[in-house]
Structure formats: structure tokens, C-alpha cells
């Protein structure tokens, strides 16, 4: 399906804008990874009345029993054992923050993911953050150049220059985005194994912010391919039109009719030709057809001076200029 140069430019702008929106949303949200954490249930005196022997039905059954003694260390005591002592809470993590569900009520508690990352991975995490910022900035530059190309659509040369620069910036942004996403994934996986005990996930998976980030990368690369395709097609079309223009208006070199040469040679040998008739040998001129292929001996394109020289050379017959 053939598309115009302006149509290809509009498609590239739309893809670049979509990539920019996806990348910005993913960078600012905290749903790159999400899952559950296994935490101990709150004991007696910490809002965990259901776990206390003197609450509810346990208080009625044990109304005559002696008060429950605290543990030697003074910590709340839990009567449950095994996996019943733990409960799962949901969490979600982004580049900047990790938020966990509050067990005692609605709301979330957030802390910096940079502080949660192991010391050995903080440098990689900061490099990932810088790469994400550069990724977004290069997307903005590429988007601006593509918009300028639309404004200069009447000028082919200016449009080609802007198209080339937009393609370069878009490709560079896509490469930076891919590296940034991979580095963050590596840091998160290491933090799952070596992070703080109270944060380590029991189970986790990638969230919608992670999907947006890779969707942004996909749109970015699609925009770069579309821009490069537009640049290549425009150059090829320009060269083709120029070649057709040059060949369509060039005249074929003048040549002598071989039958006329044979006729005058025979008459000269017989002595029947006069001087006036000797000047009547004319050169034939023909214009190239639309799809004319030059002779093997011809070398095109030729300048007008070369064509004039060949005209004079081929019209010199039998000692006279024709």
C-alpha cells in the first residue's frame, strides 16, 4: 500500500507521542512489580484482638482462668503456630517507591525503593534512573523534530534533514530505554533475594507500569523504523524523478543515415553528383522515447558541449559539412 510522505510523517509522530506518554507514565508510577509479602500477624496489644485468648469467645470460655502471662522478653504472645502465625499483604513497587498495604486499616505505607536496594546495586539503580530520564528527553527531541518536518513538508531538502536527525534521536532513545528497563529488572530481582527481611516478597509478578515501559519501547522503535523508511523512500523517489526528468528531455545524438552515405558514394564514383547535391546529405534527429535505452557505445549523461562536438563529427561526410 502506497502512502504519501506526509502520511508516513504523521504515523511516525503518532507513534513517538504514544511512546512518550507510555514512558512518562511508567516512570512516575509504582506498579512495575507487584505481589504479596508474608508478615507475622499482630499479637495481643497490637490490634490483634482475635488472636488473644481473652477476646470474644475465648474471653467467655476462659472467664475463670487466670490472666495470660506475657513472654519473658515482654513481647506479645501469639497462641497460633506454623503458617497460621503469618498473613499476606499486597505490595507494589516502582522506580522510586515501594508501597505496602496497611494491615490494621485502609491506606498504604510507602518507602523509597532506592533505600531498599542492596548497597551493591545502588549504582546500577541510579544508572537505570539516569537512562530513563535520557530516554524520555530524547523522545521529546525526536518528537519535536518530527513536528518540524511536518511544518516544512513543502521543502523536500529541509524535510529530509529533519527526518534524518529525528530517526537518529529516536533510535538512540529506544536503545537507552531498553537498557534502563533491563537494569531495573536486574536490581529488583537482586533486591528480592538480598533486600530487608520485612520487605522480601512471598510471590511477585510484573505490573502494568512494566508493560507500559516495554510498550513505550515498542512504539519508539516502530517510530524510528517508520522515520527511516520515510527518509529512504523520499530519497529514492527524488532520485528516480530526477533521472526520468533528465532522460525524458535529452535528445538522441545525431547520426548519418547509412543508406544516404551509400547513395552518395556510388554517385561520386560514377561522377554524377554535383557540388550542390553533395551538400544535401542531412543529419537525422530523433528524440529519445520515454523508455529509450542508449547504445552500448554511449556514455550518459553528457554535457551540451560534448553533444555539439558529436553533432559536428557525425555530420562531416565526404569532405563537406552538412
Curated annotation (Swiss-Prot):
Gene Ontology biological-process annotations: regulation of AMPA receptor activity; regulation of postsynaptic neurotransmitter receptor internalization; regulation of short-term neuronal synaptic plasticity; synapse organization; transmission of nerve impulse
Tissue: Expressed in the brain (at protein level).
InterPro entries membership: GSG-1, PMP-22/EMP/MP20-like
Principal location: membrane
Localization annotation: Cell membrane; Synapse
One of the Pfam families matching this protein, by short name: GSG-1
Cytoplasmic side stretches: 1-8, 144-163, 229-322
Alphabetically ordered keywords of this record: Cell membrane, Membrane, Phosphoprotein, Synapse, Transmembrane, Transmembrane helix
Membrane-spanning ranges: 9-29, 123-143, 164-184, 208-228
Extracellular side: 30-122, 185-207
Keyword flag Cell membrane: yes
Known role: As a component of the inner core of AMPAR complexes, modifies AMPA receptor (AMPAR) gating.
Family classification: Belongs to the GSG1 family.
Subunit structure: Component of the inner core of AMPAR complexes. AMPAR complexes consist of an inner core made of 4 pore-forming GluA/GRIA proteins (GRIA1, GRIA2, GRIA3 and GRIA4) and 4 major auxiliary subunits arranged in a twofold symmetry. One of the two pairs of distinct binding sites is occupied either by CNIH2, CNIH3 or CACNG2, CACNG3. The other harbors CACNG2, CACNG3, CACNG4, CACNG8 or GSG1L. This inner core of AMPAR complexes is complemented by outer core constituents binding directly to the GluA/GRIA proteins at sites distinct from the interaction sites of the inner core constituents.
Protein name, UniProt field: Germ cell-specific gene 1-like protein
UniProt organism field: Rattus norvegicus
Gene behind this protein: Gsg1l
Amino acid at each position: 500500500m502506497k502512502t504519501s510522505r506526509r502520511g508516513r510523517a504523521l504515523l511516525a509522530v503518532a507513534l513517538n507521542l504514544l511512546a512518550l506518554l507510555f514512558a512518562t507514565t511508567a516512570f512516575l508510577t509504582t506498579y512495575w512489580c507487584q505481589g504479596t509479602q508474608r508478615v507475622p500477624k499482630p499479637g495481643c496489644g497490637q490490634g490483634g484482638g482475635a488472636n488473644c485468648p481473652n477476646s470474644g469467645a475465648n474471653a467467655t470460655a476462659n472467664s475463670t482462668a487466670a490472666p495470660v502471662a506475657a513472654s519473658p522478653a515482654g513481647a506479645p504472645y501469639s497462641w497460633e503456630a506454623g503458617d497460621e502465625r503469618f498473613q499476606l499483604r499486597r505490595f507494589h513497587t516502582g522506580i522510586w517507591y515501594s508501597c505496602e498495604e496497611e494491615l490494621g486499616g485502609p491506606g498504604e505505607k510507602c518507602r523509597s525503593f532506592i533505600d531498599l536496594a542492596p548497597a551493591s546495586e545502588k549504582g546500577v539503580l541510579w544508572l537505570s534512573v539516569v537512562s530513563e530520564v535520557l530516554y524520555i528527553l530524547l523522545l521529546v527531541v525526536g518528537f519535536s523534530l518530527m513536528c518540524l518536518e511536518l511544518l516544512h513538508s513543502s521543502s523536500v531538502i529541509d524535510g529530509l534533514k529533519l527526518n534524518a536527525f529525528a530517526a537518529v534521536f529516536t533510535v538512540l532513545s529506544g536503545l537507552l530505554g531498553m537498557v534502563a528497563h533491563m537494569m531495573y529488572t536486574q536490581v529488583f530481582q537482586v533486591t528480592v533475594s538480598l533486600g530487608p527481611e520485612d520487605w522480601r516478597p512471598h510471590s511477585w509478578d510484573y505490573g502494568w507500569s512494566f508493560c507500559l515501559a516495554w510498550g513505550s519501547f515498542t512504539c519508539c522503535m516502530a517510530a524510528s523504523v517508520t522515520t527511516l523508511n520515510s527518509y529512504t523512500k523520499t530519497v529514492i523517489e527524488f532520485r528516480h524523478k530526477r533521472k526520468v526528468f533528465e532522460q525524458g528531455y535529452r535528445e538522441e545524438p545525431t547520426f548519418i543515415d547509412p543508406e544516404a552515405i551509400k547513395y552518395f558514394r556510388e554517385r561520386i564514383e560514377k561522377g554524377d553528383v554535383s557540388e550542390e547535391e553533395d551538400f544535401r546529405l542531412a543529419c537525422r534527429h530523433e528524440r529519445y522515447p520515454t523508455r529509450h535505452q542508449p547504445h552500448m557505445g554511449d556514455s550518459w549523461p553528457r554535457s551540451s558541449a560534448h553533444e555539439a562536438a558529436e553533432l559536428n563529427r557525425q555530420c562531416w561526410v565526404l569532405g563537406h559539412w552538412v
